[in-house]
Amino acid sequence: MLTFVGLGLYDLGDISVKGLEYVRNADTVFLEAYTSRLMGTDTAAMEAFFEKDIRVLGREDVEQTPREILECAAAGRVAFLTGGDPMVSTTHADLRMRAAAAGIETSIIHASSISSAVSGLSGLQNYRFGRSCSVPFPAKGWFPTAPIETIAANLALNLHTLVFLDIQNDRYMRVPEAIAVLEEMAEKRGIEPPALYVGIARAGSERPVVAAGAGANLKEMDFGPPLHILAVPADLHPMEREYLETFAGL
């Protein structure tokens, strides 16, 4: 049995009662630690809380060589822990399909997701979001412009864009850096950069930071520790504008 258990957004208080009960009764517990992180806790605290040893997995362990996960799931109850909600990532959908192909029963225990949290914190209506994108750390000889192209395509349809920010080991992209990268992409592609951004830090914590404004303003702002995420709004509905003025300093 392979059960995907969402941990929520920030700390151990975010897991559901159902998820907690399953993890504590699992035979094996894996933690996928590359698509997201819970910045309000760590692996040692999780092991103490769940009263279980936890095997931390990297991208290759899940996407390229998931044999150990599947073998454990064929023999007993496996809890596969993920930040946010498990099936927001296509990586996890692929693993579930591999398990099904091997005749292994699967299930999902849902949790809060950054996708819904952004709408709640920003007031941007969830049905007005188009395709999301991710901003990677630039590397020597590699500077993709797909993110700004996605944003431009959404804006042309009057749709908001959810922009995920890169995570690499202990390196986390911040909102000001992401805006600077997007502006460089826009210049490279000859695209007008977005006029308005909404930056969010530490969603799910007791004191998340939410700020809306022009890129020049948000690049000068200290959003504090990670994780950060960005939204690029299209034309604002009056209620969206009022919400951002009230809660995000627009």
From Swiss-Prot:
Family: Belongs to the diphthine synthase family.
GO biological process assignments: methylation; protein histidyl modification to diphthamide
UniProt-recorded name of the protein: Diphthine synthase
GO molecular function: diphthine synthase activity
Enzyme Commission code: 2.1.1.98
Positions with a binding annotation for S-adenosyl-L-methionine: 9, 85, 88, 113-114, 165, 203, 228
Record's catalysed reaction(s): 2-[(3S)-amino-3-carboxypropyl]-L-histidyl-[translation elongation factor 2] + 3 S-adenosyl-L-methionine = diphthine-[translation elongation factor 2] + 3 S-adenosyl-L-homocysteine + 3 H(+)
Organism whose genome encodes this protein: Methanoculleus marisnigri (strain ATCC 35101 / DSM 1498 / JR1)
HAMAP family, per the entry: Diphthine_synth
Subunit structure, as described in the record: Homodimer.
Functional description taken from the UniProt entry: S-adenosyl-L-methionine-dependent methyltransferase that catalyzes the trimethylation of the amino group of the modified target histidine residue in translation elongation factor 2 (EF-2), to form an intermediate called diphthine. The three successive methylation reactions represent the second step of diphthamide biosynthesis.
Pathway connected to this protein: Protein modification; peptidyl-diphthamide biosynthesis
Keyword Transferase: yes
Class of enzymatic activity (EC top level): transferase
Keyword annotations from UniProtKB, A to Z: Methyltransferase, S-adenosyl-L-methionine, Transferase
